[in-house]
Amino acid sequence: MDFQVFIITGLSGAGKSQSLRILEDLGFFCVDNIPPKLVPTLIDLCLATNGKISGLAVVIDIRTENFLEDFKEMVDTINSKNIPFKILFLEADDEVIVKRYNETRRIHPLLREGKTILESIKLEKERLQEIKTFATDIIDTSQFSLKDLKDNILKILSSFNSSVKSNFLITITSFGFKYGLPIDAHLVFDVRFLPNPFYDPKLRPFSGQAEEVKNFVLSKKEARDFIEYVKNLLDFLVPLYQEEGRNILNIAIGCTGGRHRAVVIADEIFSYLSQKYNTHLFHRDVDKDRNIAK
C-alpha cells in the first residue's frame, strides 16, 4: 500500500493512546505526543526507508506549545507533499472523561494550570475547537468499548486502502507431535489419520515439500476431503476471529514427526489462505528426522 499518515488529536481521556496502539497493531509506525512541527520531518524519514515503513501514526495534543499555529502549518506542509492523510479527532462526554481519569488515576494535562478536572476539560475543549475543524473524522468514544474503537478506526482506514484488514496475520505451522505442540497455537489439526509416507522406503528420505511425497499424500481421497473441510471451516472461522478483534491467528497442523503429512497439508492450506490474508508458513520440525533413513 502507499504511504499513509494518520494524525490523532482531541480531548485528553477520549482514547488517543488506545487508538495509537490499535494503529501500531495494524502496522503503522507510531509516535505519541509529538510536536506538530516535527511531523513533516518524521514523514520524510519514513519515506526514506523505501517502503519499509508504509504508514505513520502520531498523537498530537494540547501540551505542545504554539499548538494551533504549528498544527495549521503542519497540515499545509503535508498537503504540499501530496501524501494521503487522516486527522482523527476524539471526544467524549465530560462525565465519561472524569470517570476515566478517576479509574486510571492519571493527571489531566491542564490540571497543572490550577484548574479542577471539569474546568480542565472545558478549557481543553475551547482550545481545541478550531483544531476540530481540520478533522477528517470525528469520533465520540463515550459509549465505546475497545472493540468499538478499533472497528471505527478500521472503517476510517478503509478509505485509505480497501484491504486494510490484510494486516490481520495468519501463521500456519507444521509440526511433529513427538516434539510437542506449538505453545502459541490457537487451532490444532491432527493429520496422523492419513497414510504415512514414512513407511515407504522410497519416500522416507524426502520431506513433504518433495513432489513424490506430496503426490502420495494428495492421492488419498481422505486427504483431499480433509483439506476441503478445513478450508470451509476456516472460511467460517477467520472472519469471526477478525470481528472479535484478534490481530493474529496461529494454526498448527501436526503428524507424528512433522516431516511428511503435516508439511503437505500445511502447504495446501497456506496456498489457499494466502490468496485472502497476510499468511506466513513455518515447517517447524521438517528437518529433525532428515537422517532417519541412515
Swiss-Prot record:
<dbReference type="InterPro" id="IPR053931">
    <property type="entry name" value="RapZ_C"/>
</dbReference>
<keyword id="KW-0342">GTP-binding</keyword>
<dbReference type="InterPro" id="IPR005337">
    <property type="entry name" value="RapZ-like"/>
</dbReference>
<keyword id="KW-0067">ATP-binding</keyword>
<dbReference type="Pfam" id="PF22740">
    <property type="entry name" value="PapZ_C"/>
</dbReference>
<protein>
    <recommendedName>
        <fullName>Nucleotide-binding protein DICTH_1001</fullName>
    </recommendedName>
</protein>
<comment type="similarity">
    <text>Belongs to the RapZ-like family.</text>
</comment>
<comment type="function">
    <text>Displays ATPase and GTPase activities.</text>
</comment>
<keyword id="KW-0547">Nucleotide-binding</keyword>
<dbReference type="InterPro" id="IPR053930">
    <property type="entry name" value="RapZ-like_N"/>
</dbReference>
<dbReference type="Pfam" id="PF03668">
    <property type="entry name" value="RapZ-like_N"/>
</dbReference>
<dbReference type="GO" id="GO:0005524">
    <property type="term" value="F:ATP binding"/>
</dbReference>
<feature type="binding site">
    <location>
        <begin position="10"/>
        <end position="17"/>
    </location>
    <ligand>
        <name>ATP</name>
    </ligand>
</feature>
<dbReference type="InterPro" id="IPR027417">
    <property type="entry name" value="P-loop_NTPase"/>
</dbReference>
<feature type="binding site">
    <location>
        <begin position="61"/>
        <end position="64"/>
    </location>
    <ligand>
        <name>GTP</name>
    </ligand>
</feature>
<dbReference type="GO" id="GO:0005525">
    <property type="term" value="F:GTP binding"/>
</dbReference>
